Amino acid sequence: MTDTTERLPRALPPGTSPPERIEIDEFVLRRYAPDDDEQLHEAIAESYAEIHQWMPWCVDPVKIEDRRDFIERAALDWATGAAFNYGIFAADLRQIGAVSLMDRIGPGGLEIGYWLRTDATGHGVMTRAVTRLTELGLGLPGITRIEIHCDEANLRSAAVPERLGYRLDRVEDDQAQAPGDSGRTMCWITP
């Protein structure tokens, strides 16, 4: 999928952001802190085989320096309103995934992106996290739609918006960026 961050106007007014911490049942979505680098690294390293198939940023070797760089960029993105990146943490404080609310699809819309640690899949964690971020996103000023973009071959990722009642708005030809990509991006949109 082409990054349109620089070409499209922001959807959110300056200074607008969702909460930094969101509690959901037995887990919490929390804005990244600088000392989350080791947990983030561990979650990605342990789930590399699955995440690498769909996320072009997940490369071998998995390096902690890349996680530190991401957390620094995430802090800047939060401050500018470009993206709101959350770690998903279980009750035992272990990171089990990540979810982001991104202001990169133009006026009126935000995009949600996500990944989940392999051993945390199949328990409804991502469905509940995306449900809550969808509700929060639609409650922000000027936001009328939320989109989820994923490769057509990534059936597990596509199952989340489908379960939540998003509708498949379009499928776009795109350049494959990760090993599992088909080169076709599904764009799901809130009804």
Regions found by a protein language model. Give the residues of each.
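Short loop/turn motifs at secondary-structure junctions and domain boundaries
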Residues: L76-G81
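Conserved GNAT-fold acetyl-CoA-binding loop/helix
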Residues: H52-E72
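Acyl-donor (CoA/ACP) binding surface of acyl/acetyltransferases
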Residues: M1-Q39, A43-E50, N85-P191
